[in-house]
Amino acid sequence: MAKGFTFKQFHVDDGGCGMAVSTDGVLLGAWATLPKQGKLIDIGTGSGLLALMMAQRTAPAPCSIIAIELDDSAADAAAKNFSNSPWSSSLHCVKQDIQQWNRTQPKNNIGNIICNPPYFNFGLQADSQTRATARHTDTLTHDALLQSITHLLAPEGIVSLILPEYEGRQLIQAAEKYGLQCQRLCEVKSTEKKPVSRLLIELTSSTVKSAPQKEALCIHDSGQYSAQFIALTRDFYLKL
């Protein structure tokens, strides 16, 4: 039996990656606004899940998707997953730190960026170095991430992210210092009675200021996946 996770149109082998395929990643990949044209960058691609999801969603009008990954094992896994997918010609994995790669790129040339960033600050580390790198901001602080985004993002460009609620609201505040504003925000709960656990965040470099479009999503309803969750993710999960 193949290792990893099989979706409707592709398979993700996440062995050796710091973070396995997760609901967070699937939510972000299904929710993110599609690029209108040009390149899409996936920062910290891990196993390549987000890049693959965006490749599936943009397949009718393919765009170039560049996935950046610092960890050697994860980058190798992503490259293999890309080559085994139906969209191998559109997917490219770069094994490099985003800040180093950033220095080789022209300013304000990327229309769409997607990222499931690390969110734990210093303190208790994960049970392996690879997992720690994927989950902790020690190797990529949110300020460093925002600096890279500001350099890369084209005028009117869009950035899509997912974070725990507290870290997400902190990042939205920090983004304002870099000329990025939140234009779309989805509060995610596991059930209606639970507190908000995740924020799906869309930032833009647009200079037109307005209140963000607010959305809400409950993953479960009466012990089953909710109609909202099924509608959002049914193009990917095999059993939906």
From Swiss-Prot:
GO terms for MF: nucleic acid binding; tRNA (adenine-N6)-methyltransferase activity
Organism superkingdom: Bacteria
One of the record's GO cellular component terms: cytoplasm
SUPFAM superfamilies in the record: S-adenosyl-L-methionine-dependent methyltransferases
EC number: 2.1.1.223
Subcellular location: Cytoplasm
Keyword field contains Plastid: no
InterPro entries, alphabetized: DNA_methylase_N6_adenine_CS, SAM-dependent_MTases_sf, Small_mtfrase_dom, tRNA_Adenine-N(6)_MTase, tRNA_adenine-N6_MeTrfase
One GO-annotated biological process of the protein: tRNA processing
The keyword Ubl conjugation is annotated on this UniProt entry: no
A Pfam family the protein falls into: MTS
Catalysed conversion reaction: adenosine(37) in tRNA1(Val) + S-adenosyl-L-methionine = N(6)-methyladenosine(37) in tRNA1(Val) + S-adenosyl-L-homocysteine + H(+)
Keywords noted in UniProt: Cytoplasm, Methyltransferase, S-adenosyl-L-methionine, Transferase, tRNA processing
Function text: Specifically methylates the adenine in position 37 of tRNA(1)(Val) (anticodon cmo5UAC).
Family according to the record: Belongs to the methyltransferase superfamily. tRNA (adenine-N(6)-)-methyltransferase family.
PANTHER family registered for this protein in UniProt: TRNA1(VAL) (ADENINE(37)-N6)-METHYLTRANSFERASE
Name of the protein this chain belongs to: tRNA1(Val) (adenine(37)-N6)-methyltransferase
Source organism of this protein record: Photobacterium profundum (strain SS9)
Record lineage: Bacteria, Pseudomonadati, Pseudomonadota, Gammaproteobacteria, Vibrionales
